[in-house]
């Protein structure tokens, strides 16, 4: 309730941030994530990096997470299944799937039915922007350098 009220009040600021997020390069995203891993002394392994997606495992020997940043308008069930199978193949039990666009309804349905098998957190562009700490401050400029993925590790 509070979250939807916040989104309603700050819709213009969120839309500006979302437009800027859609323009970010995968190279910049990878730099931010890797720098945060180094600062937090976390092990990481880049699995895939191309113009549209960045896939990385982050964590320690005991607890690992698979993080996907996907620049696409809509994530399909095929993309989700690929991510889910990669988690199972690598024995990772926590996944974070971030997209600059939205998830198709099939993906949400599959996540709901698979939640006991895989723990995958889905974040569309709007949810990701709202979770950023700087968006909650007044008169704060939107900057790529202020993006943070630390809370997802």
Where on the chain are the PLM-derived regions?
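Mixed-charge (Asp/Glu-Lys/Arg
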Residues: 1-153
